[in-house]
Regions:
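A generic structural signal for secondary-structure junctions
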Residues: 20-23, 51, 91-94
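Conserved protein kinase catalytic domain
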Residues: 19, 40-43, 90
C-alpha cells in the first residue's frame, strides 16, 4: 500500500539550507550529491510502510511526529490517511 510523500514548506526550506551550508563548507560535489541522495532516498522510502519508525513524543498532545534517523539527518514526519508529510529535516552533525 503506497503512500503519497509531501514536504512541508519548512522542510523544503531546511533541505535548501542544508545544501547551501554544505556548499559553504566543501567544494566536493560528490559529497553534496551523496547527502542530497541520502535525504531523497530516506524520504521517498516512506511511501511504503511509513509506520515502521517510532513516534517522537512532543509536549503538545495534539500533534505527533514519527522520527526517522539516517546517517547524517533526523527526519520528522506525520501520516494522515495515505499521505506522509515531512515536517522537519535536521542535521545530526556536519563532519566533513
Amino acid at each position: 500500500m503506497s503512500h503519497k510523500v509531501l514536504f512541508s514548506k519548512i522542510a523544503e526550506k531546511e533541505v535548501k539550507n542544508i545544501i547551501i551550508n554544505l556548499k559553504e563548507f566543501t567544494q566536493d560535489l560528490n559529497l553534496i550529491q551523496q547527502r542530497q541522495a541520502e535525504i531523497r532516498n530516506a524520504v521517498f522510502s516512506l511511501d511504503i510502510f511509513p509506520e515502521r519508525y517510532p513516534i517522537h513524543k512532543t509536549n503538545n498532545k495534539i500533534y505527533y511526529f514519527r522520527k526517522m534517523v539516517t546517517k547524517h539527518y533526523i527526519i520528522l514526519y506525520s501520516i494522515t490517511n495515505k499521505t506522509v508529510i515531512i515536517k522537519k529535516i535536521l542535521a545530526q552533525g556536519m563532519n566533513i
